[in-house]
Amino acid sequence: MAGLFKDIWHAMTSYDRHAGIDSPYRTGRHVPLNRNSGLAGVTTASDSRADINSPYLQGDGRGSTMSFDTAYGGRAISPMPSPANGGPYSPGLVSQRQSVHQDAFDVHSPTGEIPMQNFQNGGPPPPPVASSWEKIDRWAEENYPELFDQLGEGCTVNDLNELEYQLDCTLPQDLRQSLQIHDGQERGGLPTGIIFSSMLLDCEEMVQEWENWKTVNQEFMLDPVLVKRQSQAFAAQASSSKDAPNRNQNWRQELLNKQDSVPPAAIQKAYAHPAWIPLVRDWGGNNLAVDLAPGPKGHWGQIILFGRDYDTKYVVARSWAHFLAMVAEDLSSGRWFVDEDTNELKLREFKATRVEPSYFEILRWRMDQKYGRTANKRKSMAPSMASASGMRSPPTPGSPYQSPTEHNEPRGRSLHRLTGTSPMSSPIRPGYGKPSPLARVAEEAPPTTSLTASNASLEAKAADNLMELNTPRTSGEHSKEDIKVNEDSPAKERTSEDKEKKPETEANGKATESKGKQTTVEDAEDMKDIEI
């Protein structure tokens, strides 16, 4: 009961969004980072403390006044050693350092001028995170107020410390600043996000996504020997079950062989890694994450694109500050639009309006264009000459734009694809324009005698056997009426031969009519012998 009251009191009196009363950072029972070597970052806590490089101390044992404007909220820090160069202290160094940082410039040379800064990969340093968020907030408030209302408030320093404790890593300073401005998005239920329909995660969702990928690593990507040992505990329960069908035992190695990165060697060759902290997610199992364990040619804190649809990982930005600046620039470019049906925010990267790729695909395409990576030619699904003769064609390397399938074993999304060869040819594949094999099938020959001609001859023969007779009457007072034989409607559809005989038939009909008028039927029983 006392613990519940403490939690309620802490929620009412603090601005913490995720940290609780039992946080190790609050009670002094903090367990140091890298307690789990497999989940620790490659750096130390010095990367998240702006005052750690200050070599000067105040008289009371505290650091300079800069320590009050750090991620630790002005908490007293431990005494720091003397300058690294070993030089003696001279009067005025502390005041000179404070006056330098009171100006608008962060870095000054000893002469008082702004030094030249090294470009990173040919580009200048990114703008501050606060400046990028100011542009994004201004755009969202003017163009999409509903989306602007979903942006969360900034988290506190205690929340960030608790997040680092749960993830067992040290987050970059620009990411900590970004979370203090906007702690992700509220879960409003709309299928849209501030990162062009992709959801910006808060601290709690970051931990959830990280745990999901951690579970994938533990249950699927571990050594099969370890998995077998873990499954021995449930052998008694599974003894009565049927044996599972034989599966490919080398699928883990085949999956790892497919993993690649752009640029090469910038990301570790892995399907998922515990040092990849998800920051943005789409609705298909893909994430933008900060990489805390980069490859040999990568940079700590780079933003990468990984997920179930990306065996090839992409470095989309050098840091989180670079990525926010890129998003702000895309929003200010005027190429955005909102889908009227789904209310999704999208970016029109291409001129063709019928092409509407997701923002993740646009980032992938930009990286391919930047590093000159093109897609391999897709295989034709039409049967080739080698397959027709029973010989297998040599395998070609898989394309990054194709689905990660091999040997008819689909992985990932359940797409409807043809499992066998198809006689249909696509315009973008070789063999387009060739006649289809169905066009070479011999059809049944039509009969030599026309059906219409045979019907017309039968109708003409039946018309010749008809004759016009008067109706017999019992009384002679009434005038005799003529009986006219109606011609059949199908007789109108006669061939050219019947049309030539038409005058003769009409003449014979008139003669028969005149003769019938003169003939008198004396006995009514004679009508029975007449063939009509």
Swiss-Prot record:
Superkingdom in the source lineage: Eukaryota
PANTHER family from the UniProt entry: CELL WALL ASSEMBLY REGULATOR SMI1
Claim: Transcription is one of the keywords in the record: yes
Biased composition (Low complexity): 381-393
Gene (name only): cot-2
Basic and acidic residues composition-biased segments: 475-516
Record family assignment: Belongs to the KNR4/SMI1 family.
Known function: Involved in the regulation of 1,3-beta-glucan synthase activity and cell-wall formation.
Pfam families assigned: SMI1_KNR4
GO cellular component: cell division site; intracellular vesicle
Protein name: Glucan synthesis regulatory protein
A Gene Ontology biological process term: fungal-type cell wall beta-glucan biosynthetic process
Region described as Disordered: 374-532
UniProtKB keywords: Cell wall biogenesis/degradation, Transcription, Transcription regulation
InterPro entries for the chain: Knr4/Smi1, Knr4/Smi1-like_dom, Knr4/Smi1-like_sf, KNR4/SMI1_regulator
Polar residues bias (residue ranges): 447-457
Keyword Transmembrane helix: no
GO molecular function per UniProt: protein-macromolecule adaptor activity
Organism whose genome encodes this protein: Neurospora crassa (strain ATCC 24698 / 74-OR23-1A / CBS 708.71 / DSM 1257 / FGSC 987)
